[in-house]
């Protein structure tokens, strides 16, 4: 890192109507540094990055590149200035190939009637191979979320940039994929490229970054050398308070008795088989495993989002016969997707419309929607979940990623479910918002709702859940609880490294 400033933000504000997303913020990025930007969801991090990347225009203030004021009127202008943004949310064309997506921005700037697509594909494959051995001739829509995130990163690497912005780049990646990305970031830094790194994961901030800047409530708080602060210091700056307990108290084992809310027996389908477990009253059941292990497919099978070829599902000891997701929701089994923008929320609709979407019939009389009841429902749930917004009439697209996730959860709660299956419910959410959601999930469990949480974050599985099922290659490899619930035990079961001992596995036949 040098002392030379490559990018400077001076007194930038951004307003959306009466909502102030940014208020007179400053930011400086040195050449060849990795600079972390931290803050709770709604703090203004992504808004500032969108200003730098030309997606949004500032209401006030200026942006300087190497000391010269610039007007970044569009993403194309940003790219011409050497600025690239890797979005937290997937921004790819699903019907185009990986290669076409990777070079779409570059070819738009130098389009030719004699475009050599064979060469383009070879170049794309060379870049992609730095991250993962993924065939770039595939369509993006056929890839899992983690692979789509790698394509987003590869797309940015094809641009000749001096400033590269990563917005929660590891949220959908496996640990192995994340480590490959970290190596690439260190290589880019060594070549003098400046990196802005937005993350809620303190371990990544402290292992990768030179400096950290903290925003809170749309305002600049502080910039510190990473070597001069601790993770607790950064969290205190982010939230303006101490977070005394990220995870609520667990259910006492003595209460984990009685009839199960949900029973799954010998369930099988594409990419999963012989899945059996019970979800009991008052508990939060975790599901861990590597990405691609079949965790999501099991949840989708339970709620009829994908075909089931064998087994049975019982809700309060009554066999469920589900043909489609609407049958599951009507029965009281709902699913929160890991892809909140793909299937979790409708970005262009209002917050109130999103929350009411699963059960419009309950808010309708004689064919007319009762907008007063819709609004009251939305206001109640957004208050309980702590959604930061200008009002329930605002479009979901106006919210930060974490607040969009809260709306997605509120949408499921609006139908008074008996069981909620949550796939990565806190992915990309800051520590303060995570704490709120964890407390909410525990309250729901205590109220009698069955909660199943799929998570790639081992601390979340261990800290939040009463028991954890570990999935490997489409089957439940084991179940852990109590003192046996450690990261090492879960990872050994997930990866199949070494034998699974009897102390790690329950006697219920979960071992693969």
Curated annotation (Swiss-Prot):
Residues that span the membrane, as ranges: none
Domain ABC transporter: 7-242, 257-498
Top EC class, one word: translocase
Membrane topology classification: Peripheral membrane protein
Domain of life: Bacteria
Main location: membrane
Family: Belongs to the ABC transporter superfamily. Ribose importer (TC 3.A.1.2.1) family.
Database matches in PANTHER family: CARBOHYDRATE TRANSPORT ATP-BINDING PROTEIN MG119-RELATED (PTHR43790), GALACTOFURANOSE TRANSPORTER ATP-BINDING PROTEIN YTFR (PTHR43790:SF9)
Function: Part of the ABC transporter complex RbsABC involved in ribose import. Responsible for energy coupling to the transport system.
Subunit structure: The complex is composed of an ATP-binding protein (RbsA), two transmembrane proteins (RbsC) and a solute-binding protein (RbsB).
Protein name: Ribose import ATP-binding protein RbsA 2
């Amino acid at each position: 890192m040098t002392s030379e400033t490559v990018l400077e933000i001076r007194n930038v504000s951004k307003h959306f109507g009466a909502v102030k997303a940014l208020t007179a913020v400053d930011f400086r990025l040195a050449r060849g540094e990795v600079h972390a930007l931290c803050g709770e969801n709604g703090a203004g991090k992504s808004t500032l990055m969108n200003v730098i990347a030309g997606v949004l225009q500032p209401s006030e203030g200026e942006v300087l590149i190497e000391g010269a004021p610039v007007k970044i009127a569009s993403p194309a202008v940003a790219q011409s200035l050497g600025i690239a943004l890797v979005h937290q949310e997937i921004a790819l064309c699903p019907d185009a190939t990986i290669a076409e997506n990777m070079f779409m921005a570059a070819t738009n700037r130098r389009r030719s009637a004699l475009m050599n697509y064979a060469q383009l594909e070879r170049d794309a494959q060379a870049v992609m191979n730095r991250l993962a051995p993924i065939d770039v001739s595939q369509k993006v829509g056929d890839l899992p979320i983690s692979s789509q995130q790698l394509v987003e990163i590869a797309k940015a690497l094809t641009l000749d940039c001096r400033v590269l912005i990563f917005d929660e780049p590891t949220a959908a990646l496996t640990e192995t994929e994340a480590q490959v990305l970290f190596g690439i970031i260190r290589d880019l830094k060594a070549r003098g490229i400046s990196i802005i790194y937005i993350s809620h994961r303190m371990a990544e901030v402290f292992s990768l970054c030179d400096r950290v800047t903290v925003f809170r409530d749309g305002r600049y708080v502080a910039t510190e050398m990473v070597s001069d602060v601790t993770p607790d210091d950064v969290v205190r700056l982010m939230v303006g308070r101490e977070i005394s307990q990220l995870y609520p108290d667990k259910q006492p084992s003595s209460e984990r008795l009685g009839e199960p809310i949900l029973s799954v027996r010998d369930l099988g389908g594409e990419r999963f088989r012989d899945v059996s477990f019970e979800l009991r009253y008052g508990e939060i059941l975790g599901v861990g495993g590597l990405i691609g292990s079949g965790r999501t497919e099991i949840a989708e099978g339970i709620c009829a989002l994908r075909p089931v070829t064998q087994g049975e599902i019982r809700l309060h000891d009554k066999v469920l016969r589900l043909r489609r997701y609407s049958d599951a929701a009507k029965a009281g089994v709902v699913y929160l997707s890991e892809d909140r923008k793909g299937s979790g929320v409708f970005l262009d609709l209002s917050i109130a419309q999103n929350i009411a979407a699963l059960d419009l019939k309950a808010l309708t009389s004689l064919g007319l929607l009762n907008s007063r009841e819709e609004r009251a429902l939305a206001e109640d749930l957004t208050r309980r979940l702590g959604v930061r917004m200008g009002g329930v009439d605002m479009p979901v697209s106006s919210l930060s990623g974490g607040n969009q996730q809260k709306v997605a959860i509120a949408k499921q709660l609006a139908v008074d479910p008996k069981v909620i299956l949550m796939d990565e419910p806190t992915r990309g959410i800051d520590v303060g918002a995570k704490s709120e959601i964890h407390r909410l999930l525990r309250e729901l469990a205590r109220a009698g709702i069955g909660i199943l949480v799929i998570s790639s974050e081992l601390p979340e599985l261990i800290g939040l859940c009463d028991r954890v099922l570990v999935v490997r290659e489409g089957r439940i490899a084991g179940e852990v609880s109590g003192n046996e619930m450690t990261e090492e035990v879960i990872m050994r079961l997930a990866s199949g490294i070494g034998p699974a001992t009897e102390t790690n596995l329950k006697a219920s036949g979960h071992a693969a």
